[in-house]
Amino acid sequence: MSTTTEILAHHWAFALFLIIAIGLCVFMLTGGFLLGGRAKGRAKNVPYESGIDSVGSARLRLSAKFYLVAMFFVIFDVEALYLYAWAVSIKESGWIGFIEATIFILVLLAGLIYLVRVGALDWTPVRSKRQVVKSDIINTTNTHPQ
């Protein structure tokens, strides 16, 4: 028996799964294309607001802070996954594994401290912080005792 037939014999279920998944995707895309309605005209690009005429632009500018928080979450979530894998195999890793995990946690802590110091986790912009500090200074210097 050759190696290609052995590979096919062992992986026929995966190949069948791939064929069915790709076929289902093609079927759904062509079905939507053939059965879907086609609107032509200016009203096609106007959003439908439950019968209410839309007012203003639907494009909102979101702060990049949402993106940063999502990235920090993914990074720390993957690191938590590594710690979970270490915790599962703690008996096999012994003291060397404990020391490595401690170093790993200290590196994570250093990264978190760096993010806090840089201000990556602050939601208020630096401009508004300066305005708050200046307004507090102005309010304290302009107060007249009565």
From Swiss-Prot:
Pfam families: Oxidored_q4
Enzyme class name: translocase
Molecular functions per Gene Ontology: NADH dehydrogenase (ubiquinone) activity; NADH:ubiquinone reductase (non-electrogenic) activity; quinone binding
Membrane topology: Multi-pass membrane protein
InterPro entries assigned to the protein according to its UniProt record, in alphabetical order: NAD(P)H_OxRDtase_bac/plastid (IPR023043), NADH_UbQ/plastoQ_OxRdtase_su3 (IPR000440), NDAH_ubi_oxred_su3_sf (IPR038430)
EC number, UniProt record: 7.1.1.-
Main location: membrane
Catalytic activity entry: a quinone + NADH + 5 H(+)(in) = a quinol + NAD(+) + 4 H(+)(out)
UniProt keyword terms in alphabetical order: Cell inner membrane, Cell membrane, Membrane, NAD, Quinone, Translocase, Transmembrane, Transmembrane helix, Transport, Ubiquinone
Any Gene Ontology CC annotation: NADH dehydrogenase complex
Localization (cell): Cell inner membrane
Membrane spanning residue stretches: 14-34, 68-88, 96-116
Subunit structure as annotated in this protein's UniProt entry: NDH-1 is composed of 13 different subunits. Subunits NuoA, H, J, K, L, M, N constitute the membrane sector of the complex.
Family according to the record: Belongs to the complex I subunit 3 family.
Function per UniProt: NDH-1 shuttles electrons from NADH, via FMN and iron-sulfur (Fe-S) centers, to quinones in the respiratory chain. The immediate electron acceptor for the enzyme in this species is believed to be ubiquinone. Couples the redox reaction to proton translocation (for every two electrons transferred, four hydrogen ions are translocated across the cytoplasmic membrane), and thus conserves the redox energy in a proton gradient.
Protein name listed in UniProt: NADH-quinone oxidoreductase subunit A
Species name: Pectobacterium atrosepticum (strain SCRI 1043 / ATCC BAA-672)
Gene behind this protein: nuoA
